[in-house]
Amino acid sequence: IDTVTVGKQPSGMSINRAGNLALIANRADNSISVLSIQGKQVKLVDTVAMGEHVAHVAFTPDGKRALAGKFPGHKVALLEVDGSKVTYAKRDLAVGLWPYNLDVTPDGRLALTADNGNNGGSDGNVDTVSVIDLEANPPRVIDKVVVGDAPEGFAISPTGRLAVAVLLRGSNNSKTEWFYNRNGSVVVLKIDGKKVTKVGEVEVRGLPEGAVFSPDGRWLYVGNFMDEDISVLRVDGDTVTNTGTLVKLPGKPASMRGRTQ
């Protein structure tokens, strides 16, 4: 119904829980676009300079803060939100290498980042998920959890009990590379208070990038870019299993959107 012009190479987007403000991370522009939402009207109201490439952005549940992943800087920027005014006071947190995706728990206590590693691609070496304590003053990184090679897609369940990091595992690399795998995988992380622990790993298909939970948290859907389909996984407590069901798509799924922040 309309087109809104933002910055160059828009890479990540987040809409606040109230549904009246959206932020877009513009990778090639080193900026974040601020959009107001009123009914079906969406307008660009501001652009915030970030100084470096930003790959993704996420609101906290109360809408008073947002976090932006500074992809090549290996940092997460903290932004303050007051109405439609978004301010960046150059407060950054050092996380793992090449943070690409990030999410905030539904209770707003933690933020987790998928640290993609190796300039945003597989190299056979393990990478991490960084754990940020948002209740601390000031917020800080309290842990880094080793997950595997090249976590890109990332999601936290609606209950806040689980998170998943989607590993590329060299599935988009040449078959001659020593770290090549035909399929990627999903690493399951248990969230217990402020402790995050790897509890499982499930193989999916080629170059998995996006992941979303169903609203009730009982299902997980993973988009497989190379195979042009979606893997359907069942969630039972802390256990995630691949049902083997595939939903064929007419194109390559590069990202997916799930629960409201």
Sequence positions of predicted segments:
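Predominantly soluble domains enriched in secretory-pathway, periplasmic, or organellar proteins
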Residues: 1-261
